[in-house]
Regions:
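Phosphopantetheine-dependent thiolation modules in NRPS/PKS and related acyl-activating systems
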Residues: 2-37, 41-47, 51-82
Length: 82
């Protein structure tokens, strides 16, 4: 699995979680760039990502990412350790 595939899966999870499918996600996309991606949606997104990839985030990891690219890097690092 590469970073592009991870971002595509994250995009699908975000779109479903915020019920908004009219955006294109890139590595530079930030939470505030997506309408309705609030703190409640963020909790749902994190849970869905953990389930999709079979991983668990630590608190510091969840608060450290600033963009989807950062999040994808964390996911990739965790998946590689499985």
């Amino acid at each position: 699995m590469d970073k592009k595939e991870v971002i595509e899966k994250i995009e699908a999870i975000v779109a479903t979680s915020v019920n908004h499918h009219e955006f294109t996600m890139t590595e530079a996309t930030k939470q505030e760039d997506v309408r309705a991606w609030d703190s409640l949606a963020n909790a749902m997104i994190i849970t869905a990502i953990e389930q999709e990839f079979g991983i668990k985030f630590k608190f510091m990891e969840m608060s450290s990412w600033k963009s989807v690219g950062d999040l994808a890097n964390i996911v990739l690092a965790k998946v590689e350790k499985l």
